[in-house]
Amino acid sequence: MANIYRDRVLNQVTEADIDSTLRVAGWVENIRDHGGVSFIDLRDMYGVLQVVIRDPELLKGIKKEECISVSGIIEKRDEETYNPKIQSGTIELDAKEINVLGQVYTTLPFEVMTSKEVREDVRLKYRYLDLRNQKVKDNILFRSQVISFLRQKMTEMGFVEIQTPILCASSPEGARDYIVPSRKYKGKFYALPQAPQQYKQLLMVSGFDKYFQVAPCFRDEDARADRSPGEFYQLDFEMSFATQEDVFRVGEEVLSATFEKFAPEGFKVTKAPYPIISYKQAMLEFGSDKPDLRNPLRIIDVTDFFQKCTFKPFIGKTVRAIKVHAEMSKGFHEKLLKFATSIGMGGLGYLEVLEDKSYKGPIDKFIPDELKEEFRSLAGLEVGDTIFFMADKEDRAAYYAGMIRTELGEKLDLIEKDAYRFCYVNDFPMFEKDPETKQIGFTHNPFSMPQGGLEALNEKDPLEILAYQYDIVCNGVELSSGAVRNHDMQIMVKAFEIAGYDEEVLKSKFGALYNAFQFGAPPHAGMAPGIDRMIMLLTNEENIREVIAFPMSGTAQDLMCGAPNEVTEQQLREVHIKVRD
């Protein structure tokens, strides 16, 4: 749309405009002086156009990153000066008039074109400059395209987009709440939602069949490379009269469509149906409940076998093993041992299978000769294989094995490249025991339906009860968690009772659900894939903050606007707050 600042955006200026007079606007990306003739690379959100300045008076006082409007005549470039890197690389604008729209008053803190090389805290302080960098900006524009597609896809699948409240009641859902004091009700607080969990379930009780939203979620958690502190966004959806398998099909359809559309060229995407791996199987074979299926290595359990051997460090412990077919130097083993000790292991035993099918390695002498063939069969060993061992308590052995599996996959270059490998992990334990207090608590979402229903809750050991809970994992990154919800009041009361909450606590903490479930709640289920993590994977960024327009720092600070900040004594009094030293 033409106006007083520009006739069109830069990617709309083409060879068809040659000899035309145009006005364009943008930022001064670069200034080059070629002795009597100067050039400006003018940048807007859509592209870059070279501006030729033959009158030095036009350039006087103009600095990099100033916002300017330029009018002039579009010309064909000399063929030897074509720039194939930009869309307008065969044309340029011969400037006749330049107006400064937004002046640069102080020294730039960094070069915009190389801002990704600058320290992160400086980038975040001047994020509005960092976002002028084409790669940084492209991530945010890409995010917009993905979210638009997700909305379109969910709508096509019959889901209705509904916004749920941002100010809600605090409830014990796992992470710490961000709380907001009430001015009107002294001593009472709102909380920012960790997820729209209760509201989306209440929508199902209200008779909405399929709900979704691009939901902001707020959790007072520490940052990680794949977790932004403060807030994040998820594609939250819920379905009435739905089973676990129904949710799986929806998750597969929307994620497959999204990744197939937006994956970099040449990348492979898992076809539906996705593999389904139980939590128990995942912890055994992958040493993690977030298995990376690009890594071909698998972990096996050899605990029972080694209880028949004489190697004391393995006696009475869980023993896991990883078989690898690759040549490894002495230096490789030394580096792997160093890694093993860095994660807390006391050592790293191994065996190599030689040409005559005998073993070489520090553990060989502890395996009786009459058991060696049994072990070869158990582990599926072939000539040229090396098998590594991890032994400890079950949870530590699984952790160590998972870490060694990942290290081997990376260092031996076994990880499948250019691929997005999805799977579901399901059958999570419903309850867990706190190692310090010994109290039974929920492992995951407290609103999940236990497998076996009320009968299981009444008759089984709580630690043996599984829940209809599931995660979607892609390349070792948890994209989503979800569950079949517990919509039966009797089952819910009993489940909370086992976790140490009596019915009165259930009424007070989750009163809306408790009351709503008195009035004919339908069976329902859902999940919520993380949008930030999706885009992080699709852009191949290692840090989630690279795909968020205005992220907090790793220390949960907004370095640009200064949050969290102090407020006035008057503001504190209005909400009945006194800050303690």
Where are these regions (language model features)?
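Class II aminoacyl-tRNA synthetase catalytic cores and aaRS-like
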Residues: M1-D581
